[in-house]
Amino acid sequence: LVTSFSEIDKNINKDELIENTEQFLKEKAVYHTMLKAAEDISAGDVDTYVILDKFEKSCNISLVTDLGLGVKSNIDDIIADLTTVEDKIPSTWEWLDDALDGGFLQAGKSLYVFAGETNIGKSIFLGNIASNIARQGKNVLLITLEMSELLYARRICTNISKIPMKEMAVNGSSLRAAITESSGNIYIKEFPPSTITPNTIKAFAKKFTDQGIKLDAIVIDYLNLIHSPIGNNSYERIKNVTEQVRAISYVFNCPIISATQLNRAGFDQDNPDLATISESIGLAATADVIMSIFQNDEDRDLGIIRLGMMKNRYGPRGMTQPMRIDYSTLTIEQADDIDLEEDDSMLNTLAGLSRTVQ
């Protein structure tokens, strides 16, 4: 039956169809088991063992026939896979791409998260990632739960055109030329915060595949503003949201890049760790890569913002990299001319001299 449906509509995701069909059959089986149990109880025929057995069978319905990978029987496939190079989508920041072994996984099945304190620039990083991916001729869906579509579009336009945001209004022709000549496309969709679930995002993204548009990346600003009907506390809700969002990358075979907040302990901290992620350590356990964004007062004055690797399933972690940020065009670039130790030492010396003078 599932195969028949997939032959009718080539855009149907077979795994998702099996999952939904399986869920439907389970719900129907449980419903009919409840009705039968009620009838038996009314007739005075109560056998709790039989009732429990029927409920367990109903809940254990499975349409999965694939037994997985047999290490012995599939050794040739395993050996062949050792030399397979997975396609990546570069972030265009050399430090990050090296850490990710080439960039974001093009086939998806991965969730990348930027973590930072309030107003540190998480949306600026997400906007830069969206622009950098689109410049490679890719289609990017950007879900915004905090800013309006037009405000986000302004940020994207100033980044792509390199026309300062304050000057775009008087440079309409140059702006139009820069945007129309750029490769790829970015689709920005705004939803009110805390009103949509991961399923809402999945249903919306499906509209693109229904129209024959392959999404190469999905950017979500940001995870904590997605609603979860499941969970009695913030830990359970954020954990569920993160798991469901990561699952979307399997459905559309593209990476998902998002952001999250740091808690108070992570504010003004150099190179914050996973313990400073706000609300739920479940997010840290689920995401494949988590990058910290941090900046001190001296950095801000010098137009520097730092990126740290908090968690990385695809490479090393624990290192940091200074980035240059141009606030006039909201452009972030790797700062290779800055030596971390030497720069930090200089900044600390200047800060000490400043305190002495005061």
Feature locations, PLM:
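Structural recognition of the conserved hydrophobic beta-strand(s) that form the central parallel beta-sheet
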Residues: 255-260
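Cytosolic-facing regulatory segments adjacent to core modules
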Residues: 97, 102, 132-214, 228, ...
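Noncatalytic partner-interaction/assembly domains of nucleic-acid and motor enzyme complexes
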Residues: 1-24, 357-358
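The Walker A/P-loop phosphate-binding site
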Residues: 63-163, 176, 186-188, 351-357
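Walker B catalytic acidic pair
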Residues: 222
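Amphipathic alpha-helical transducer elements in NTP-driven molecular machines
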Residues: 11, 27, 90-93, 150, ...
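Conserved ATPase-coupling elements of RecA-like P-loop NTPase cores
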Residues: 227-234
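C-terminal regions of RecA-like/P-loop NTPase motor modules
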Residues: 199-218, 232, 244, 250-252, ...
